[in-house]
Amino acid sequence: MICEPSGGYERDLLEALWAAGIVVSLVNAARIRAFARAQGLLAKTDEIDAAVLREFGELLKPVALEAPAPERKKLAALVQRREQLLVTFSTEEQRLVQTRDPAVRKLGARLIKQLQTQVEQLEEMIEKQINDDATLKQQSERLQQVVGIGKVTASTLLAEMPELGKLSRNEAGALAGVAPYNRDSGVLRGRRTIRGGRVQVRRVLSMAALVAARFNPILKAFYQRLVAAGKPKKVALTAVMRKLVILLNHLIKHPEFTLA
């Protein structure tokens, strides 16, 4: 079976397929549309989409999506809820700044306080969920050995990137959305770009890279070399993100590996 993401609505289908023992692949919608366009199919209907999905699966044999373990599933739910509340928290703070009416400001401030309390409760639940599972706890501690990786980044990676430790270097970079893609043709050498990947993974990695570029001795030197060579700071930070996710994947894959 093959399907594509649909804003979370695909989860019930995935759960039902896993429960029935049916192998399923979840493929990025952009790949499916590119596959359709390559065949000259520009129209988009449910019937066309179903036919394209079937043919894509038959020809390219995408990797099957494994059912998450119950403890990972619980962690993912908690982490995703934390992210939702943080987005709402930020939005309400911006609204409060622009609000002038005293009564409305009071209501807004009360809501922000409630959101903050819920975020703190979720942080406690996330920490407990990780500490109650030996594997999650060990992996979280392992990730946090890297300067730049804190509890939030570690919990997000464990929840949103459960494949960590099972990937190749290129797969880790691509899944995080920090793998460089060439745009070359003939003698033309275009700029390398990044795209795709998991949004929340890329977001926490970007924050971790900012810290690592300042305080991680190895990655700081790497970042400074790139900047000194003329690379834009944003490009250099993206390179740090890629180094980070490759290192983190290696740490989980090889428990015997120790950081110098």
Regions found by a protein language model. Name each.
Residues M1-A109, K113-Q116, V235:
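Phosphate- and other anionic-substrate recognition elements at nucleic-acid/protein interfaces
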Residues M1-E4, D49, L53, L85, ...:
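Short, conserved catalytic/metal-binding motifs centered on acidic residues
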Residues L85, L115, L143-Q144, L167, ...:
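A short amphipathic alpha-helix within small helical-bundle interaction modules
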Residues L96-V152, M161, A213-N216, K220:
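Helix-hairpin-helix/helix-loop-helix acidic hairpins
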Residues K151, L157-A229, K233, L259:
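Phosphate-backbone recognition surface of nucleic-acid-processing proteins
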Residues A228-A260:
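Basic, amphipathic alpha-helical segments enriched in Lys/Arg and hydrophobic/aromatic residues
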